[in-house]
């Protein structure tokens, strides 16, 4: 789909391959230039995620001229919609409440019990993002399609949205739309709810267009069909043609949800405003590797680009798998001996089936992007120090509290309130026995694994058992004091990050 726009409102496309400073250099410079000309009141800077929005907002607020603007400084919420996600800007001024995962999700599940799937930490944490129905609904909306058309034109919807079929999806959709507008039985008030899809649609239906001096859109190539309509609407009243789409068609990763690389490839030829050429992130090896993939795309659309690497040479290694590939020992040794950072990234959750076993088999500490270490050092130390504690070594007050966190109830004679009563000092096992906090019979149980809480649910118990084996491996491989330098996350999470070493799963893709 190519959107038709009047000549005055055509976006100026600022193009830059990976790591060329599109966001943190060019956007800041352009924003400052526009601020000096128009002031900040009607300059709108949009991105796709809250994380990106917050980073941009922080960077703008740290500009010296912004710090000295008394109007901005007197209002802590000044940038709330002026630097925003596309959804949040579209919601501005709306009178509907946003569908809430804490209150509305449980109520919806009561209305449609088949929404409740096998217990999933991801779905519990954010059903709007991870539940198969909401994924399907959002991706269909992003493509500008009804669910039935989206389903019938997707590569493998049964796998993407399992365990549901099309009939289930259509039924849930009907219940969901009814739910958003029905009365809440608890309050007898009409719910009047909206989700992210509704925010965009309501904005696009509004007959009036916003008054904007300038519009800048970061990572514009990831915009969906309805988002592009919204951006076109926002751009109608800008001054002096100040509409800037900043991005790179070759980095489009949301085609399954409506982003359109073909539209942006053509726009990069017809509406090119600025091309950033100097690479600030990728080594020579990575630059060459990426060019081998994207140069044919440049040629297909009849253009070429300059994209220079950094001065770092770098290396690219081929690892067909993480079991017995040539060069695997080199990777393992490097993780063990260097202080460099390592990022494992993948396309789908299925890739974790080979990444996580590899890390845990080798006793490497790791964390999922944006989260704490998968198994905390405090928990690992409980298993390591417990036998020493039983043999008479003193343990710190903090370590004793950590024991109490993990011990089963029947293995403690008192609950954690004891730590508010006793002195903050080191204690021996015998001292805690004499104080009446632990039973002396525990002295024969040197294996802390035998004493910890065990989940009742079978699936969680299996994960618990794997966790215990992993902790043993860390201790047995003498990796106790190893600092966690390993992270893993999918392609969408890692975009824009810089790490010393990146291990990429190329085996699974999504059309």
Language-model features: where?
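The feature marks helicase ATPase cores and/or their adjacent C-terminal helical subdomains
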Residues: 1-511
């Amino acid at each position: 789909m190519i959107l038709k726009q009047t000549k005055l409102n055509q976006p100026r496309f600022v193009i830059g391959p990976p790591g060329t400073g599109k966001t943190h250099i060019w956007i800041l410079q352009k924003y400052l230039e526009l601020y000096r000309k128009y002031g900040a009141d009607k300059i709108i800077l949009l991105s796709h995620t809250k994380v990106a929005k917050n980073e941009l907002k922080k960077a703008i607020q740290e500009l010296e001229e912004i710090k000295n603007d008394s109007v901005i400084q007197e209002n802590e919420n000044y940038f709330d919609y002026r630097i925003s996600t596309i959804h949040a800007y579209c919601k501005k001024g709306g009178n509907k409440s946003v569908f809430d995962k804490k209150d509305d999700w449980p109520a919806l599940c009561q209305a449609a019990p088949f929404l409740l799937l096998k217990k999933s930490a991801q779905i519990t944490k954010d059903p709007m993002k991870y539940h198969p129905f909401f994924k399907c609904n959002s991706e269909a909306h992003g493509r500008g399609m009804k669910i039935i058309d989206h389903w019938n034109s997707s590569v493998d919807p049964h796998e993407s949205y399992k365990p549901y079929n099309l009939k289930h999806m259509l039924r849930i959709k009907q219940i969901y739309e009814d739910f958003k507008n029905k009365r809440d039985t608890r309050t007898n008030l009409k719910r009047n709810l909206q989700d992210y899809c509704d925010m965009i649609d309501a904005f696009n239906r509004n007959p009036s267009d916003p008054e904007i001096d300038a519009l800048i859109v970061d990572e514009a190539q990831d915009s969906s069909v309805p988002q592009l309509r919204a951006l076109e609407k926002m751009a109608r009243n800008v001054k002096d043609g100040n509409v800037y789409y900043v991005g790179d068609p070759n980095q489009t990763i949301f085609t399954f949800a409506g982003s359109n690389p073909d539209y942006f490839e053509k726009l990069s030829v017809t509406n090119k405003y600025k091309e950033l050429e100097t690479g600030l992130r990728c080594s020579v090896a990575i630059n060459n590797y990426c060019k081998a993939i994207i140069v044919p795309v440049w040629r297909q659309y009849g253009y070429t680009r300059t994209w220079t690497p950094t001065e770092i040479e770098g290396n690219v290694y081929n690892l067909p798998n993480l079991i017995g590939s040539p060069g695997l020992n080199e990777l393992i040794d490097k993780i063990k001996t260097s202080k460099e950072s390592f990022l494992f990234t993948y396309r789908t959750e299925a890739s974790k089936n080979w990444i996580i076993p590899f890390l845990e088999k080798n006793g490497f500490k790791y964390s999922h992007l944006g989260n704490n270490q998968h198994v905390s050092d405090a928990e690992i130390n409980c298993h390591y120090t417990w036998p020493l504690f039983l043999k008479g070594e003193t343990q710190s007050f903090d370590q004793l509290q950590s024991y109490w966190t993990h011990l089963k109830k029947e293995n403690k004679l008192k609950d954690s309130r004891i730590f508010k009563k006793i002195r903050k000092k080191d204690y021996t096992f015998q001292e805690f026995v004499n104080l009446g906090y632990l039973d002396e019979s525990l002295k024969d149980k040197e294996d802390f694994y035998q004493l910890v809480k065990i989940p009742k649910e079978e699936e969680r118990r299996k994960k618990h058992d794997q966790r215990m084996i992993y902790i043993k491996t860390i201790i047995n491989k003498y990796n106790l004091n190893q600092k966690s330098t390993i992270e893993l996350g999918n392609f969408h999470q890692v975009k824009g990050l810089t790490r010393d070493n990146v291990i990429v799963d190329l085996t699974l893709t999504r059309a």
